Design a protein with these regions (language model features):
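N-terminal secretory signal peptides
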Residues: 1-10
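Functionally engaged cysteine thiol sites
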Residues: 7, 19, 298
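A short, amphipathic alpha-helical segment
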Residues: 17-20, 330
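Sec-dependent signal peptide hydrophobic core
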Residues: 19-23, 193
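Hydrophobic h-region of N-terminal signal peptides that target proteins for export
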Residues: 23-29
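Sec/Tat signal peptide C-region and signal peptidase I cleavage site
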Residues: 31-33
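Extended, low-polarity segments enriched in aliphatic/aromatic residues
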Residues: 35-397
């Protein structure tokens, strides 16, 4: 598949065909019109992060192992470090971000399976490549660097160490945009893994292995202060461009397919996140439900509270994994907008299923390890601005 790259000048004449230097870039498969694929999903019990390595290894074994997937390969590992720590510092009693121990132990298992390199990927502010910034999230960079394989740390909020962006076309034409420009770290890996949390989301209803990829888009091009020419030193998040559609992306970046479509974030966010999964398919989905939160994605939201499901969910297909994750949260992946947990937005899992990424039919998904009944925990109605205690008090009154 031919890709375009986009340099920091941000003009149309600088949109070039990706050359031979990117021959190893990801080939996005054409999606079949047949039934969306179903793969095995593992659920394992894990009550403590001290057991995470052994339990995740068990989950990998239950889905058929990962050696064939990663041996001799470069693996991209996308984290979920949502929330600027300058405003929202580490909050141990609200474990809504990727846990540092899960990063180290996942890298260890990838190395043990033969991965030659792991690119740890996330977008955050400030948009620099300072390794010290990762420690703000409780990640021991030195420990991760000594897990048995070469490790690169990529803040993909802008160009980073690269000179050009890569243009990735959405295989089915796109829900919101026909293509997106990303940092080249996303194609400088043979395998792409999503390490996410099991939690609610204010707009998307839930956030797991698929929603984790919404942050793939660089704020230099899709942030609120991207301007008409792009901004390699962004300070504003994606709301004006992606969530609300009030601000256009810079010159040279693909425009929306349907500018007359709703400006409602509940319409836009689910479709953009499915586009993101389409342009950079998830080869390995890991959902951390050891400790997490319910009621939303972070402490800027009312009603957020700690949850301890004590599970890890893993598989090769993000839709299948998130479908099982929803069942563990006591939700249905078949639910429509307006029913729990899709209080404010459309169901991204059904949108992904519609374009052939994966199935939301639990009857077609083989579940290894714990059964859903054994793992299930009540996450309540979703992100409604109230804790479970407050909701129960309302029911009694």
């Amino acid at each position: 598949m031919k890709r375009d790259v986009f340099s920091s000048g941000f003009t149309r004449r600088e949109v070039l065909a990706l050359g031979t230097g990117a021959a190893a870039a990801l080939a996005v498969p054409e999606l079949s019109r047949a039934a969306a694929p179903a793969t095995t999903v593992a659920i394992v019990r894990c009550r403590s992060y001290s057991d995470f390595r052994a339990k995740l290894a068990t989950a990998f074994d239950q889905i058929g192992g990962i050696q064939k997937l990663v041996q001799g390969k470069t693996v991209g590992l996308k984290l979920n470090l949502t929330g600027n720590p300058a405003r929202f510092p580490l909050t141990p009693n609200l474990p809504y971000r990727t846990n540092g121990d899960t990063v180290a132990n996942t890298v260890y298992l990838l190395a043990k399976a033969g991965a030659k390199r792991v690119r740890i990927i996330e977008s955050f502010f400030p948009a620099t490549e300072d390794l010290g910034l990762w420690a703000r999230y409780g990640i021991d960079v030195n420990a991760v660097n000594n897990m048995g394989t070469k490790v690169d740390w990529e803040n993909v909020q802008n160009l980073g160490k690269y000179k050009q962006y890569v243009r990735l076309k959405v295989p089915w034409g796109g829900y919101m945009y026909p293509a997106y420009y990303l940092n080249q770290a996303f194609v400088d890996c043979d395998v792409y893994a999503s390490l996410s949390k099991l939690k609610n989301h204010w707009i998307a209803g839930v956030t797991m292995s698929m929603k984790n990829n919404f942050g793939d888009t660089p704020c230099s091009l899709y942030g609120g202060d991207c301007g008409s020419d792009g901004n390699e030193h962004p300070t504003k998040e994606r709301g004006p461009v992606l969530h609300q559609g009030k601000t256009k992306a810079p010159k040279g970046v693909d425009a929306e397919l349907h500018p007359d479509s709703p400006r409602d974030p509940g319409y836009r966010v689910p479709r953009i996140l499915v586009d993101q999964v389409g342009i950079r398919p998830v080869d390995l989905a890991i959902v951390d439900g050891v400790e997490t939160v319910r009621g939303g994605e972070g402490p800027w939201l009312p009603g957020l509270e700690r949850m301890t499901p004590g599970v890890i969910i893993a598989g090769r297909n993000p839709v299948c994994v998130d479908t099982v994750g929803m069942a563990v949260m006591s939700y249905s992946a078949k639910a429509d907008r307006g029913s729990s947990p899709f209080v404010r937005g459309d169901n991204s899992l059904k949108l992904a299923e519609a374009v052939g990424i994966g199935t939301t039919d639990l009857n077609r998904i083989e579940i290894a390890g714990l059964s859903i009944a054994e793992a299930k925990i009540d996450f309540g109605p979703g992100a409604v601005g109230k804790t479970m205690k407050e909701l129960k008090a309302e029911q009694k009154s």
